[in-house]
């Protein structure tokens, strides 16, 4: 079951990166400006290291699924629904990079009606829940901290770009 989960998550991330590349091309044709380029490689690296850490901790420490695995898995699936709701709500404006088309109105539909950054909430929950599924507490704690640091930089950069270039 562990390797199936890892395979699903890796395929999901690869598909999201492909969508992000397509969306980047679309919005750049509309005049999108990229922000936060300097921290972007750190975000990619953190996500790769998250998976490597999770695999290492589960295998080397012979971690087994939590006795609460069914409930945790149900929450993870619910979080995925929010992920794709956010992605679909942004349409071509969804990206892993900070790309802002000057003068375009901020999206206020889907989960963006209630939250400014629902996809970041999804990532926070995934970094907590996926390791929790296998009792990989070291990975959960370390990467929650790394993610918090990176998101504090990223969200500030994104908010500044949106504030400056988007129509409210």
Swiss-Prot record:
GO CC annotation terms, alphabetical: plasma membrane
Subcellular location: Cell membrane
Annotated coiled-coil segments of the chain: none
Keyword set, alphabetical order: Cell membrane, Membrane, Transmembrane, Transmembrane helix
Residues that span the membrane, as ranges: 1-21, 41-61, 68-88, 123-143
GO molecular function: protein C-terminal S-isoprenylcysteine carboxyl O-methyltransferase activity
Recorded topology in the membrane: Multi-pass membrane protein
Main location: membrane
InterPro entries, per database record: ICMT_MeTrfase (IPR007269), Metal_cation-efflux_comp (IPR052527)
Name of the protein in its database record: Uncharacterized protein YpbQ
Species for this entry: Bacillus subtilis (strain 168)
